[in-house]
């Protein structure tokens, strides 16, 4: 997993082969962030929420591009541990990994976000329950 641009550009993190989730490809990330660049002012240090964080690939890219805070929600214990480990290596205090269920977190969360990214790794019957 590689960071495309920003302060962590070029950093690599090896994902264990045992992971169910695969990182968002560089091609997909580049296209996603090319679109987002038209809507998000990275210099304004937005606050972001990464739901179903998986490998943390999007979390890393958001941090690298200048988000003042990124909260990452991941339910799988191994994936959460991996996300926490690379955040610890980076010593980035703007990253807040949370191990837990996305829907439980959202039902209790009162914080406002400038950007919310949701990429569930499976078909979600509750997708309509995600707030706008």
What kind of feature is each model-predicted range?
Residues 1-132:
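Class I S-adenosyl-L-methionine-dependent methyltransferase catalytic core
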């Amino acid at each position: 997993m590689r960071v495309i641009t920003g302060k962590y550009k070029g950093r690599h993190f090896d994902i264990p082969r045992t992971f169910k989730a695969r990182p968002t490809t560089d091609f997909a990330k580049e296209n996603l962030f090319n679109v987002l660049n038209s809507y998000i002012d990275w210099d304004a240090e937005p606050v972001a929420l990464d739901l179903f964080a998986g490998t943390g690939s999007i979390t890393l890219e958001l941090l690298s591009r200048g988000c003042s805070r990124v909260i990452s929600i991941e339910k799988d214990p191994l994936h959460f541990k991996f996300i926490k480990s690379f955040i610890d290596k980076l010593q980035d205090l703007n990253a807040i990994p949370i191990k837990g269920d996305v829907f439980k977190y959202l039902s209790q969360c009162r914080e406002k976000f400038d950007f919310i990214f949701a990429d569930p790794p499976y078909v979600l019957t509750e997708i309509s329950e995600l707030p706008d």
